[in-house]
Amino acid sequence: MSLLIDFIDETEEVKEEYVNLIREILGKAAQMEKIEDGAELSVTFVDNERIREINRDYRDKDQPTDVISFAMEEMGEGEMEIVGVEMPRMLGDLIISIPRAKEQAEEYGHSFDRELGFLALHGFLHLLGYDHMTEEDEKEMFGRQKEILEAFGLGR
C-alpha cells in the first residue's frame, strides 16, 4: 500500500530521516487500516507560534499544541459531495509543531523519533475518523495507536 505524502517544512529543521520515519509509520498504519493505494495527505512541520495561530483561528484555543489534523472527508455545512469522478482519496492535512514534539519527548523520557512518530500517527488516525471525545472512542483510538506503534517498533 502506498500513500502519497506531501511534506512541507516551515521550520527548515526536519532531517530527511524524520521525513522517512513518518512516511514509513504512516505507510504501516495505512496498510493496517486497509487504506487504498494512492490516498493522499500533507504533513507540515511548523514552530510553536505558527501552530498557536492555527489552533486559535480554527479551534478557538489561543495556545500552541503538538499536532492538528484537518480531515478532508468530513463534510462541512453547505458542502456538496462530488460523485462519479475518479480522484485519489484525499485524507487531509497534518500540522506538527517540531518544538512541541521535542519538548514532549524530553517530558515523557523517550526519543524524538518516538514522539514524532506518535504525533504523526495520532493525527493520521484522526484523519481516518478516530477520535477521543468519549471514553469508549478514546479506548478504541489509543488501543489502535498502541498496536500500530508496536508493530512498527516504536512501542513504549
UniProtKB/Swiss-Prot annotation:
Q: Which Gene3D superfamilies match?
A: Metalloproteases ('zincins'), catalytic domain
Please name the source species. Bacillus anthracis
In its keyword annotation, does this UniProt entry include Nuclease? Answer: yes
In which family does this protein belong, per the annotation? Belongs to the endoribonuclease YbeY family.
Q: Which residues bind Zn(2+)?
A: 122, 126, 132
Q: What is its EC number?
A: 3.1.-.-
Keyword tags? Cytoplasm, Endonuclease, Hydrolase, Metal-binding, Nuclease, Ribosome biogenesis, rRNA processing, Zinc
Which molecular-function annotations from GO does this UniProt entry contain? metalloendopeptidase activity; RNA endonuclease activity; zinc ion binding
Protein name, per record: Endoribonuclease YbeY
Q: Which GO terms describe its biological process?
A: rRNA processing
Q: How is the cofactor bound?
A: Binds 1 zinc ion.
Q: Which cofactor does it need?
A: Zn(2+)
Which Pfam families does the entry mention?
YbeY
Q: Which InterPro entries match?
A: MetalPrtase_cat_dom_sf_prd (IPR023091), YbeY (IPR002036), YbeY_CS (IPR020549)
Cellular component (GO) terms are: cytoplasm
Q: What top-tier enzyme class does this entry carry? A: hydrolase
Briefly, what is this protein's role? Single strand-specific metallo-endoribonuclease involved in late-stage 70S ribosome quality control and in maturation of the 3' terminus of the 16S rRNA.
